[in-house]
Amino acid sequence: MNLSGKKALVTGGSQGIGQAIAYRLAAEGADVVIDYVGHAEFAQQVVTEIKKLGRQAIAIQANLDFVSEIQGLIQKSVEGLGGIDVLVNNAGVEKHAPFWEVTEKDYDFVLDTNLKGAFFVTQAFVRHRMDVKQPGKIINISSVHEELPFPHFTSYCASKGGMKMMMRNLSIELAPYGITINDIAPGAIETPINTQLLNDPVKLKALLANIPLGRLGQTSDVAGVAAFLASNDSDYITGATIVVDGGLTWNYSEQ
């Protein structure tokens, strides 16, 4: 895939799946903005590594809970790279709690980042592409839990289900402007957020028994799909969810 000339913004791009996507887009020729909310040193390290590939990269801090910061993020991204034509909505959080114990604070913590944040980052990106009268690509990092239940993570599932329907609606609204939008739905991916699971042999064995390919996914598995969706090879794909789960969705039973 050739992403030469592409300029991408990856939210939550300093760690985990977002970091892997940022590296892969750069390796394919794109310049990249790394959005982060904390741990500036992680974001700066990603910038340093991307520059070693001969690409432009900048890190911008923004809390996606606030629309004013989102607008600033898009403005700074455009100024820093001379425009952005690929948006990767990767930033996301989760909160484990039985439904009857979820507080308003817990709910807002998850929905503000996962859905509200993605909604308004996408809106600001679309306005930019309309202003310059050019097409664009939006890639949402959703989850298999936009379809599958996940007990004790109801707010998370609600956010990803909402992201799915936002994507489907926008695929119709944005098509006349040449802007495509798709979801990537990762399954169980080996990232720092899953450290507790990885250190629990019993839970890990039960999970792997649900995955036909018999292994956890790697961040590179997701990054490869993101690079494809950012490329011209995906120009006729919009409104789709690409599942990256080793077959988990079709062989799933909640433990």
Task: Enumerate the language-model features and the residues they cover.
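Conserved glycine-rich cofactor-binding loop
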Residues: S14-Q15
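Substrate-binding pocket helix/loop in short-chain dehydrogenase/reductase
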Residues: P98-F99, T103-L111, L207
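Active-site loop immediately N-terminal to the catalytic Tyr-X3-Lys motif
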Residues: W100, L148-T154, P176, G214, ...
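Active-site helix of classical SDR
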Residues: T122, S159, M167
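Alpha-helical segment proximal to the catalytic Tyr-Lys
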Residues: R127, I172-P176, D235
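Residue(s) in the substrate-gating loop at a strand-loop-helix junction
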Residues: S143
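Short C-terminal tail/terminal secondary-structure segment
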Residues: L148, A227, T238-Q255
